[in-house]
Amino acid sequence: MQTSMVSAKVSIWLVCSVICSSLVRATQSVCSSQNTATTDGVRNQFQSNGWCSNNCAGHQFAIVQGFMCWCSDSEPSTQTSVGDCSGTCPGYGYEDCGNADKDLFGYIYLGQTPLSSVQSVETSTESSVYVSSSSITSSSSTSIVDTTTISPTLTSTSTTPLTTASTSTTPSTDITSALPTTTSTKLSTSIPTSTTSSTSTTTSTSSSTSTTVSVTSSTSTTTSTTSSTLISTSTSSSSSSTPTTTSSAPISTSTTSSTSTSTSTTSPTSSSAPTSSSNTTPTSTTFTTTSPSTAPSSTTVTYTSTTASPITSTITSVNLQTSLKYSVITVTSVHTMDTNISEITSRYLTMKKVITQIYSSTLGATPTSAVATTSASVGGRITNNNNSNTTNSNTPTNKSTEKKGYWDSPGKIAATFVVVGVVCLVIICILIYLIHHYRTRPARKAQDFENEYQSKFYQSKYPNEVTTTTLHTPSPSSNSTFSTPRLIYTDEKGQIMSESPSPRQSTYSLTAGSPPNDPSTLASPFHDPILPRRTSTFLHSPIQKQHEKMESNVTLGEDTVLVDQRLDPSKMLNTLANDDATNHSTISLSDNVDYSRRVLRLMNE
């Protein structure tokens, strides 16, 4: 009976809880003028808080205003009193659906957490994650480097202080392998690690790869000595001397050297300290690598992969605090081309690791520096420069000679342009001469014709006199007695009178002593038979004797014009002034002068 009553009460309590929770969820919790809806609004004629809440299932808020319903996942930044959203819902008059008159939206919270605790819950979660991450980082004190990092393993108890500002790790060495033509740099930082332990012995097995270098026509001896190895670094050198590598730390270096009658030995030495935990001793690391100054000129490299035997190492550490500032690995690739076979025959890979500022903070020791240089050559035939004095003998410097082209020689370029310029200048001069010669050809032909005419004319007129013919025009400064009258005046009697001389000098000089009215000399240069008849008036002239007594020294030039004086206005009155003017005929012209040649010359020009 009691059980049934208890079950009935529980049922009633559950029904009331469901009803109350539904009523609470369907009530406006925020009223705001902002609409932060993330979905499109839905219009419902029978809008109510319950219907909009069901429509926005899965969202944080259901927004109502009159007939509209929106869904949102964010709370508005500005809020007003919930009593302002007093608009009645169209579908259920007992509920409020915002306020359309005041443009207010009612927010119905659909989440399970109260509004006031949403932000605090998120903040608490972030803080928890942060603390968890810090715990993980602090607990991992053995290594924070990538998977290629090898750290010493100690059998003693290690205590590391928890510091949130930095991470703790034991001294580590990064081994990075890179292909040629790549450069990689690794930076590692660490904080002090406090370790207290006694002397212990650890046996470990590690695998390493050694390189055997065979030198042509020589004896190769390879010796590899390794001790206290937790981290292995391969160093290859080739010289006539014996390089020595010394180590004083839980870090060892395996060196393989191959030359003719040469052996390279690595002797790492680890420092020991008392086993008592109360004493502290600093530990420093020093790498010294001796490289030869000469190298063979031709070497054939052969690679052999071997597996080392198990290594037994003894580690002694006492309360050390070592800080590694930075570690740099530089990888340089050099490609060399052999000009004899015209192909790349060798590749050189050089790795240089520099570790600086290694000190012990317990005793305040002076900071020391350690430099470890690792070199490896990858490829086929190696050609070295025998005169190179470099620190690393495994990085030969090859000088490839390249043939210079035409454009790399300034002398060839200058000579070519000079020859081309001279040829172009000669061609231009020839063209100028041909153009000038062609343009002056008509004038030269006319001049030749005139010269020939004048020569024949005066030779036929004065055959017994000396005639001097000059085919060129003398310069005005020359000592020449030639003078050329500008105009030659003649009358009908054949008398020749000269006017003032012309500044131009004549190309023809004529000295006449015979009477100008000689029938034989007055003939045409082409011996025209008509001219003797025309000159008959000159033979019977009453003043013939007077003309015979006159000596004429007339110089005829190229531009000499024979003109009758009666045609010149300045000579018009000369006949009236002369005493024998009445004896001169003023009717006929000088028929003995052939004017046809002059006319033809003017027409041709």
From Swiss-Prot:
Assigned keywords, A-Z: Cell wall biogenesis/degradation, Glycoprotein, Membrane, Signal, Transmembrane, Transmembrane helix
Membrane topology summary: Single-pass membrane protein
Biased composition range(s): Polar residues: 497-521
Keyword Glycoprotein in annotation: yes
GO MF, any single term: protein transmembrane transporter activity
Transmembrane segments: 415-435
Compositionally biased region (Low complexity): 381-399
Subcellular location per the Swiss-Prot or TrEMBL entry: Membrane
Glycosites: N340, N386, N389, N398, N479, N553, N583
InterPro entries, alphabetized: WSC_carb-bd
Position of the signal peptide: 1-26
Database matches in SMART domains: WSC
Keyword Membrane part of the UniProt annotation: yes
Domain WSC intervals: 27-110
Superkingdom per UniProt: Eukaryota
First-listed, main subcellular location of the protein, grouped into a coarse class: membrane
Swiss-Prot/TrEMBL GO biological process terms: cell wall organization; protein targeting to ER; protein targeting to membrane; response to heat
Cellular component aspect of the GO annotation: endoplasmic reticulum membrane
Sequence segments annotated as region (Disordered): 151-305, 381-404, 494-521
Name this protein carries in UniProt: Cell wall integrity and stress response component 4
Gene: WSC4
